[in-house]
A protein has these predicted regions:
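Conserved GNAT acetyl-CoA-binding A-motif
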Residues: 128-140
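Acetyl-CoA-dependent GNAT
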Residues: 11, 19-99, 103, 108-110, ...
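Conserved catalytic-core motifs of GNAT/GCN5-like acyltransferases
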Residues: 137-140, 152-169
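Positively charged, low-complexity/disordered segments
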Residues: 171-176
Length: 176
């Protein structure tokens, strides 16, 4: 496989990043089960559920906002493969103290499942350590089965689940 080059984003990258296909297709979702076996006890479990058919899931945030706010993000790293921009990872240190959050991770559809997302996450870990943060959190939808599998493969642990009206979010973290 050709070498993946990862570097900070520059202005010329932004139109290319906005045009990446940010949505994804999934055959599974993670479903949360809540049980109350007795007073004062709550058991929460997650189980993988196969969907009756593949589902295309839209990206949860407006991608076009990247054009206006890319310079205000804590970090924005770009992956290049054979001199072509093929993905990016957006980082924020403003959400929680001593923590870097991955708020966006997008890979060009035709080069997915080739290690590019993993390389960007490893680069984000290095960036987070250099920025004196102690945790890296991946923020994702519970429908994003491919991203959840990648996070588990890379050794991330579940650190939260947000079931607010409108958008469910799953957090996976690793200690740096």
């Amino acid at each position: 496989m050709p070498q993946i080059n990862i570097r900070p984003a520059v202005a010329a990258d932004i139109p290319l990043l906005v045009e990446l296909d940010h949505d994804y297709v999934t055959d599974y979702v993670w479903q949360m089960d809540v049980q109350r076996p007795e007073e004062g006890q709550i058991n929460i479990g997650f189980r993988q559920v196969r969907l009756p058919r593949s589902a295309r899931v839209e990206y949860p945030r407006p991608v076009r906002a990247l054009r206006e706010n890319w310079q205000s993000r804590s970090g924005l790293l770009v992956a290049r493969l054979q001199d072509q921009v093929v993905g990016y990872i957006s980082l924020s240190k403003e959400i929680a103290p001593l923590t870097t959050w991955v708020t966006d991770l997008a890979i060009m559809r035709r080069v997915r499942r080739q290690g590019i997302a993993g390389a960007l996450i490893f680069a984000a870990q290095e960036w987070a350590q250099a920025s004196n943060t102690h945790r890296l959190v991946l923020d994702m939808q519970p429908k994003n089965y491919p991203a959840i599998c990648l996070a588990l493969k890379l050794g991330f642990d579940l650190c939260g689940y947000n079931d607010q009206i409108g958008e469910r979010r799953v957090g996976k973290e690793c200690r740096l």
